[in-house]
Amino acid sequence: MGIHGLAKLIADVAPSAIRENDIKSYFGRKVAIDASMSIYQFLIAVRQGGDVLQNEEGETTSLMGMFYRTIRMENGIKPVYVFDGKPPQLKSGELAKRSERRAEAEKQLQQAQEAGMEEEVEKFTKRLVKVTKQHNDECKHLLSLMGIPYLDAPSEAEASCAALAKAGKVYAAATEDMDCLTFGSPVLMRHLTASEAKKLPIQEFHLSRVLQELGLNQEQFVDLCILLGSDYCESIRGIGAKRAVDLIQKHKSIEEIVRRLDPSKYPVPENWLHKEAQQLFLEPEVVDPESVELKWSEPNEEELVKFMCGEKQFSEERIRSGVKRLSKSRQGSTQGRLDDFFKVTGSLSSAKRKEPEPKGPAKKKAKTGGAGKFRRGK
């Protein structure tokens, strides 16, 4: 879910924080991508007029989505995929709710199938989609053959994407989860891995502008996000987005808001874990950006054909064609961006951003199969 209603709220009260760009605008940019979110998008992709996300046996697969969306970034984008680690304990309540919703969707799917309601069948089938360890492992193997770096986050992928962006290792974090801003990513990109059929422009959300327009610091913004509703604790019933903004701007903290609220009108949840949620957002368990070395290498064409065609039964012609496009883009992206060498003034994206040094668990290193070093494609 991320943060409930945050994208709409920013569009309403801080529209200058949002930019829309064509993918060609990102030539030479390094971007940290939430891998699990991308895989989920590939698994629920609607295949209109073609079966590009299915193999010759008709099996839906995330591999072709990962292959083609990564190649789609042939305008010189340098992606690094970040995979989820162990979910934080605070998320257990949200995960339990998702299991309940999945069980209910299974019942509704069966009823829709018996009634022959095709649209309802598709809707409830999507609700049952879940990214598995096998999906992750196969996509990691594919990325290594493509020469694309990836890493395993110790916990939430979007938090580690944000850490990489804060440290300047990448230009932005790419995910659909708005809590990437709550974790402190200076720039959040949405729709980067969305289906081409949707024709969605890439949206950029700039945290510094959000804070400036709202008149908040990062700690107050975190409190606002908790009031809106997150994956990690309940929100206060009866407080909508506009009211939440007004309250945090006036009282500056959740603690002061709670002290002044009428409990009969706005009852605070019992055993409310807002302090734990604050700490999780401000000091998340993330990769240590300084230990991460990002390298992109040439794709291994023959091993890709062996894996994608021999094992997974995809068209060899499509795979070899894709490899050629990937190699061509790799050569182009090595030229670099002009603003990597010259400071560009008056540009939102080129503004220097000073972020606080990560503390405590934020310094934890990436989990990379026990090797202790960042794994990269060969």
From Swiss-Prot:
Bias (Basic residues): 361-378
SUPFAM superfamilies: 5' to 3' exonuclease, C-terminal subdomain (SSF47807), PIN domain-like (SSF88723)
Protein known as: Flap endonuclease 1
Cofactor(s), names only, from the UniProt record: Mg(2+)
PANTHER family found in the cross-reference section: FLAP ENDONUCLEASE 1 (PTHR11081:SF9), FLAP ENDONUCLEASE FAMILY MEMBER (PTHR11081)
Cited SMART domains: HhH2, XPGI, XPGN
Region ranges (Disordered): 325-378
Maturation and modification: Acetylated by EP300. Acetylation inhibits both endonuclease and exonuclease activity. Acetylation also reduces DNA-binding activity but does not affect interaction with PCNA or EP300.
Annotated residues for binding of Mg(2+) 2: D177, D179, D231
Source species: Mus musculus
Gene name as annotated: Fen1
GO cellular component, one term: mitochondrion
